[in-house]
Amino acid sequence: VDYSFFSPPFKDLYTYSDDPRDLSNVTSSDEFYKHFRYLVPELFRVLKNGRLLSMHIMQGTTSIGKDGFLSIIDFRGELIRLFQESGFIFHAEKMIRKNPQLAAVRTKNVQLMHGQTKKDSSINRPGLADYVITFRKPGDNEVKIKNDIDFDLWCKLAEPVWMDINESDVISNFRKAKANKDEKHMTPTQLSVIRNCYLLWSNVGDVCFSPFGGVGSEGCQALKMDRKSINIELKNSYFNMNVHNHKAFDLEKNSVLTLF
């Protein structure tokens, strides 16, 4: 494949299904990494020499109920080391701003609450950003990546922190893929994040691959930008919505308006 973009399960932070094959359905971090280690060499194998792979991730946290203390877990760093072990070169990292007030309302995390500053602000911490970490496979890139990126756009893309990503800029029908019995959390990646990465690190006509295809965010954005899409998805409800969205995007792109 020419480029891979995906958002992996965030260890045991979110559980997406009760399927024992689901990487998010684990009892510990050690169990997650034991299974994830099988995937990384295969990602290295299918990626073309000199090309890139990007992951959309966030840091993990501990909890009082489960761990007995509050702290940040360096999930980002653990993944970087894991991919380097398999031969990948750590190429780039992008931080994405997230609204700490929205996170406080959604998670009810005491560390983000303003009221906690009135009691004991040693407990408080800033909100957590998202990250896109990008790796390069060693070797010469035979087909150079050349897109029409003007100077102003490049200055925006080159910023170390993307401040303007709208957290609601996600594929519109993702909630329809929700399964009643086993759904725990749904976290589609913002389309603008995927678009920026495709623009930087893939050409028109390239094959873009996601091993965690979800409801099709990466794949549909690939089609929209005249790339080709390969997605893998374990969960049936996600897979069915993924197929539906791919077909809908393909139909929309190839439709012709006829005037009579």
Where are these regions (language model features)?
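S-adenosyl-L-methionine
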Residues: V243-F260
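Core catalytic lobe of class I
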Residues: V1-M241, L259
